[in-house]
């Protein structure tokens, strides 16, 4: 990224601050320059590597989106790692921010994500229940099979760990006044969603901020979410669950990047001074 302001190096998913990165904030635990160097190394290594943005880059990109609805959409991609066809159907009731019994804010809010297949299965089950008359034996069998598939493919809960994002969700729910079952982004085409991201990238470019990852797509934010977790040493099994990967190999694709940097992190060396080696080997 060409002219990304150095002072925007924060680790929070979506909060940009103006603190000096050498003294405070995320710079204490997020080495931006090393992260960029590692990403460049991965890009040079080959094409079979994730194409991802870093937290400071996403923060700058989000800051260029004045439309709150569009910003919240990109924010949701980044904070959940959801696939585009999982994000677009999200409703207010999919976000569990408060205790259903007391109404108190949850300390660990989350969003319920459903794949396209899961939504189709649930819709098929609802359609059968709405059917009139006594179901035939074949219809009963089909319903049992659908319910079994739903049990075997449950939706996943993704924790919302960024307080700033949760607060923006709350504010949007109040501002938009949406019913619980209404979609947050009632758009017909996935191309519209992609164009919102392109508009944000173009706005950043007008301010002299460019990104080395081109084009920036919904998949970019999914990969960025996964890499953000890897960078913070979240266990691979947890990442697999949050990403909705059935196969662990899909998650290993992200951890492979850090294999390029493991020897530096661990201080592994293979050379040894011959004199010191001789002292160890020769009898005293």
List where the protein language model places each region.
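Short basic/aromatic active-site micro-motif
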Residues: 190-194, 211-232
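Basic, Lys/Arg- and aromatic-enriched nucleic-acid-binding interface segment
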Residues: 55-84
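Catalytic-site neighborhood detector that most strongly recognizes the C-terminal catalytic loop/helix
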Residues: 105, 243, 247-268
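Active-site/catalytic core of tyrosine-dependent DNA strand-transfer enzymes
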Residues: 133, 137-144, 154-212
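C-terminal catalytic core of tyrosine-transesterase DNA break-rejoin enzymes
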Residues: 75, 220-246
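Conserved tyrosine-mediated DNA breakage-rejoining catalytic core shared by Y-recombinases
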Residues: 89-171, 259
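Residue-level marker of regulatory loop/turn positions in helix-turn-helix DNA-binding domains and
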Residues: 50, 65-66, 76, 210, ...
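C-terminal secondary-structure termini that scaffold catalytic or DNA-interacting sites
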Residues: 1-38, 45, 49, 129-141, ...
């Amino acid at each position: 990224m060409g002219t990304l302001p150095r002072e925007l190096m924060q680790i929070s998913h979506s909060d940009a601050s103006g603190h000096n990165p050498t003294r405070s904030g995320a710079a204490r635990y997020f080495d931006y320059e090393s992260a960029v160097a590692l990403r460049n190394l991965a890009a040079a290594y080959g094409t079979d590597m994730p194409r991802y943005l870093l937290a400071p880059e996403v923060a700058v990109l989000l800051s260029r989106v004045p439309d709150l609805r569009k910003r919240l959409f990109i924010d949701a991609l980044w904070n959940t790692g959801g696939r585009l066809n999982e994000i677009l159907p999200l409703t207010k009731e999919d976000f569990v921010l408060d205790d259903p019994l007391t109404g108190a804010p949850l300390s660990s809010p989350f969003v319920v994500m459903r794949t396209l297949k899961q939504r189709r299965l649930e819709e098929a089950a609802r359609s059968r229940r709405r059917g009139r008359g006594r179901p035939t034996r074949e219809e009963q069998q089909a319903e049992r099979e659908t319910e079994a598939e739903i049990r075997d493919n449950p939706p996943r809960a993704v924790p919302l760990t960024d307080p700033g994002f949760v607060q923006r969700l709350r504010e949007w729910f109040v501002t938009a006044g949406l019913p619980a079952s209404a979609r947050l982004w009632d758009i017909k085409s996935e191309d519209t969603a992609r164009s919102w991201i392109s508009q944000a990238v173009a706005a950043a470019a007008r301010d002299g901020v460019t990104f080395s990852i081109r084009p920036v797509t919904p998949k970019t934010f999914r990969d960025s979410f996964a890499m953000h977790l890897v960078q913070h040493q979240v266990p691979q099994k947890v990442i697999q669950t949050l990403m909705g990967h059935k196969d662990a190999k899909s998650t290993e694709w992200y951890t492979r990047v850090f294999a390029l940097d493991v020897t530096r992190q661990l201080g592994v060396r293979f050379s040894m001074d011959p004199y010191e080696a001789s002292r160890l080997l020769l009898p005293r």
